Amino acid sequence: MNHSNLANPTVSLTVTLIPKHPIRHLTSPIPNRNFTNPKLLFPLRLNETPSSSLAAKRVFIVRATVDGDGKTGNWVNRLPIPGLGAENVFRLISSATGSPIGQFISSPVTFLHSVDPRIKLVWLLTLVVLPARANLVVRLGLVLCTALLSILVLPRQVWIDQLARVSLLSGILFITLGLGSDGAPPMLQSRTPPSSITSLPNLPMSLSGYSYMLLKLGPLQFTRKGLSVGSTAACLTFIIFQSASICLATTTPEQLALALRWFLFPLTYIGVPVSEIILTLLLSLRFINLVFDEVRSVSLGIVSRRVNWQQLTVLETLDIFASFIRRIFKNIFRHAEQISQAMIVRGFRGESSSHKIYFFSGSSNKFADFASVLCLIGVISTALLSEYFLV
């Protein structure tokens, strides 16, 4: 029997699905600018195929670096911070070391150039002690006098650069110590019984308007203790740095060494090696100029090469900074070796007492010395009298 002619049995079943809730469109409404006519993005109905409803497709490509000619992009140089650029760092170093910091300025010649260096050292000691012991008015007066003296004595570009940096450092110290010394209020519990128990009226906090807290910034508070600590540190920093800079700018290293030797000479009777100390100080003051010159010349050499920092990686940039520091130390050690060889050629054998050191110092002006001593006495008298009248 041939079974190929027989038909296969089939069963047909009709199923009708009635949903309990109405079918909604799976849409994502996105309003326009006026928020009045919302539009539907990619409407998806049950009677449509996914290929027709999801025709638009957005492709996202994630890249870690910038592509270009098969090279790895330097993501550090593309940070939105312009101060992180290596070239900007080298330019700042070259400009900072370009101004004479702690160096003698021979011109223009001012009245401070003719003052005796021993009087200048006494002035330095006075300007260190007075701000720490005087009140706020005297401190601010000394700061203003030091700033005015810098403007009168130093060249314009020099005093602008120095005053800006010292003022920035002093301002940071004032804000930090002013808010940090007594900024967090202590959690104290009063031991005085309330007025309801003692049957005494509440007394005012102050009869003369005195207030310990001067300013309140959220959780921080600026008190009188913070004002005292911050002003003392800021004024001391400004006066010490700027007065030392003025002294070094108007006095040669030989004059400073001779003045310090005059003050330390009585210590030779108790065995203090004054000659070695003075020689070390003289060499240190002479060596400051060499250090600044080397830092400036090496940084300018790197800037003048016009290195394309955008194509360098982080390790390559760090390698350039390491070579920069290594080159500076190499040049400094070479200069130190040359100085030692020059001293040996001139007969120095390591004993300062047996080797004669000639201090070439110009003659001071008697009128300038007398005026400086009078000003010194006036400043000390004003600081002492302020403790009795300015309370």
From Swiss-Prot:
What's any one GO cellular component for it? plasma membrane
Its lineage opens with: Eukaryota, Viridiplantae, Streptophyta, Embryophyta, Tracheophyta
**Keywords associated with the record:** Chloroplast, Membrane, Plastid, Transit peptide, Transmembrane, Transmembrane helix
Which residues belong to the transit peptide?
Answer: 1-63
Q: Which InterPro entries match?
A: ABC/ECF_trnsptr_transmembrane
Superkingdom, natural source? Eukaryota
Main subcellular location: plastid
The entry's protein name is: Protein ABCI12, chloroplastic
Q: Where exactly are the transmembrane stretches of this chain?
A: 134-154, 168-188, 229-249, 263-283, 370-390
Tell me any Pfam family this protein matches: CbiQ
- Membrane topology qualifier: Multi-pass membrane protein
Q: Where in the cell is it found?
A: Plastid, Chloroplast; Membrane
